[in-house]
Amino acid sequence: MARTPKPERRALLTDPRDRHRAILETAARLICEKGYEGTSIHDIAEAAGLTKAGLYHHIRSKEHLLLEIQNYGMDVFEEKVLSHVLPIADPLQRLKECMERNVLLVTQGWSKEVTIILHEHATLTGEARAQINARKKRYVRFLETSLAEAIRTGQIRPVNTKVAAFAFLGMVLWIYKWFRPEGAIPAERLASEMQDLFFAGLETRARGGGKRGGKGKKA
């Protein structure tokens, strides 16, 4: 008896609007579980409910699929984080909102794409790697620029903006390694506490008060 396709497979085969996105998400899940080298085109096609020939109708190659996954992850990040924080005029508030949205992005269903951007970027070669690196560098520049603005306005103390930007990224991008949705810390509380920890080390005493990093208080 033929196996009944899983609901996600049926949706993948019948809804052309979501088909490509579903392939990317299926491939992202497999690559997170098995690594890029350990995931074959056959694995992806089977998980997506397609033949290899059917899969190649949607992708050029395995490496190009990896590029598309990373671009998809960056697209999601820009939609759910950057598009909301770029219009914020106050640089400190912009940074705080950026951290909160970053944390929620990683903890609420997009950790696969973050994992692949972090761990599989070196697998890409040539123009593909340059394209992803350019997008990542734009985000680092955004953080450095926002930090520099906050220094100029006296909201945070003078610091090396590159060091601060990468410290910011180090905090938020590696959450997926240890955060568990079913654990004792809800995602919203985690975002608040990480804001307290990070910005308590940056804000001037005039803004931060005598004691920094109040327990559980949202920045």
Placement of each model-derived feature along the sequence:
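Helix-loop "lid/cap" segments that line or gate small-molecule binding pockets
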Residues: 84, 100-108, 116-123, 197-201
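Conserved hydrophobic residue
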Residues: 36-37, 156, 185
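N-terminal intrinsically disordered/low-complexity leader segments
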Residues: 1-18, 206-219
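Helix-turn-helix
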Residues: 22, 26-64, 68
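Hydrophobic alpha-helical connector segments
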Residues: 68, 82-112, 165-168
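Amphipathic alpha-helical segments used for helix-helix packing
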Residues: 94, 107-127, 144, 177
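Hydrophobic alpha-helical segments that form the core
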Residues: 157-177, 189-200
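Amphipathic alpha-helical packing segments from all-alpha helical-bundle domains
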Residues: 75-78, 116, 126-152, 162-166, ...
